[in-house]
UniProtKB/Swiss-Prot annotation:
It is an enzyme of class 5 (isomerase). One of its GO terms (biological process) is double-strand break repair via homologous recombination. It is found in: Nucleus. SUPFAM superfamilies: DNA topoisomerase IV, alpha subunit. It comes from Oryza sativa subsp. japonica. InterPro entries: Meiotic_Spo11, Spo11/TopoVI_A, Spo11/TopoVI_A_N, Spo11/TopoVI_A_sf, TOPRIM_Topo6A/Spo11, WH-like_DNA-bd_sf. This is Meiotic recombination protein SPO11-1. Its cofactor is Mg(2+). GO terms for molecular function: ATP binding; DNA binding; DNA topoisomerase type II (double strand cut, ATP-hydrolyzing) activity; metal ion binding.
Length: 381
């Protein structure tokens, strides 16, 4: 009886959530139609319609940031405004023209309750858009203009992330039961809105930078011996991976650890999870995981675990430029001074190495020694 009552409550909540999303979609569609009608009326009257777009910036790389002085960067407050005019010549007119064309596609998607990818939109007007980045910017502009996220526009990416471990959930009507084989990889859902009934007995979430490391842990049956959820974004994480991680953190309230290569690009991937990306600054506060813990690998691990010299690689000039650029970001001075010190040590020593270098100790050293002991002993920053 209690079980049936619980299922009824869950069904009622799912129904309420469905209605809320339908109302949000209807409201957004109404606002889009209103803007399009206004633009058409302005042009018909011989006037130049203008659209004001807030400009967001979640971090900067200025000299003042390096001096640890205050800057205007914020996760939820705009730092400026761009005014786009359709009839003026120049880049702003082109930008507004592209925005309106993409907006018409979005309007059609919402009216017909259909979805498409950014690439689909590009191929609708390739001679006008010229390159994919133009469409990407227009989608970001629309999100800023209507204060919504990309998924609200029915523009969906192709998810590349993977998950395994002690978790099960429903994705629409599909059951995703990772717990039946905790070492098997499952694709991360494209739409977080389709997820419901999440259940987990995990103690923590582990993010690994690369699929090769993810597969190493799967082969070593890491999740059988450690009650956890393992996720990889397979390099720089896409939006579905970041949204999925943020969703799990909010639902399960578990600590999150991140394992990346000891190089500037690994550090940048780690920073993307914690602080968000500059391209999606307007949405960073809803995608980032501010309490993520850096588990490794650290430059100091090379000496601590007595790895052979052949595992070390010298930082290239490109690596150095990347590291110096990251070091100037204001959030490292403001929110993660220990992370900054670790990156400075890497730059000072001029070396880097990959997670897989730990296999020099033994093939399963990463899964049997490095990760479990570091988490148990609290050796993370």
């Amino acid at each position: 009886m209690a079980g049936r009552e619980k299922r009824r409550r869950v069904a009622a909540l799912d129904g309420e959530e469905r209605r809320r999303r339908q109302e949000e979609a209807a409201t957004l569609l109404h606002r889009i139609r209103g803007l399009v009608r206004w633009v058409v009326a302005e042009v018909a009257a011989g006037r130049s319609p203008t659209v004001a777009l807030h400009r967001y910036q979640n971090y900067c790389s200025s000299a003042s940031a390096a001096a640890a002085s205050p800057c205007a960067c914020s996760y939820d407050v705009p730092v400026g405004t761009d005014v786009l005019s359709l009839l003026h010549r120049g880049s702003h007119a082109s930008r507004l023209n592209v925005l309106l064309r993409v907006l018409l596609v979005v309007q059609q998607l919402l009216q017909q309750n259909k979805h498409c990818s950014k690439r689909d939109i590009y191929y609708m007007y390739p001679s006008i858009f010229q390159e994919q980045a133009v469409v990407d910017r227009a989608i970001n502009d629309i999100c800023v203009l209507f204060k919504c996220s990309r998924h609200n526009l029915n523009v969906v990416p192709v998810a590349k992330g993977l998950v395994m471990g002690w978790i099960r959930f429903l994705e629409g009507e599909k059951e995703v039961y990772c717990v039946t084989n905790v070492n098997a990889a499952f694709s991360i859902p494209v739409s977080i809105e389709a997820i419901k009934d999440v259940v987990s007995v995990a103690d923590y979430i582990l993010i690994v930078e690369k699929e090769t490391v993810f597969q190493r842990l799967a082969n070593d049956k890491f999740c059988e011996r450690n009650r956890c959820i393992v996720i990889t974004g397979r390099g720089y994480p896409d939006i579905p991976t970041r949204r999925f991680l943020r969703y799990l953190v909010e639902q399960l309230h578990l600590p999150v650890y991140c394992l990346v290569d000891a190089d500037p690009y690994g550090f940048d991937i780690l920073a993307t999870y914690k602080f968000g990306s500059l391209q999606l600054a307007y949405d960073a506060n809803f995608l980032r995981v501010p309490d993520i813990r850096w588990l490794g690998v650290f430059t100091s691990d090379f000496e601590d675990y007595r790895l052979p010299d052949c595992c070390l690689l010298h930082l290239s000039s490109e690596d150095r430029r990347k590291a110096e650029g990251i070091l100037s970001r204001c959030y490292l001075h403001r929110e993660a001074p220990q992370w900054r010190l670790e990156l400075e040590a890497m730059l000072q020593k001029g070396v880097k190495f990959e997670i897989e270098a730990l296999s020099a100790c033994s093939i399963s050293f990463l899964s049997e020694e490095y990760i479990p002991k570091k988490i148990k002993q609290g050796r993370h920053i």
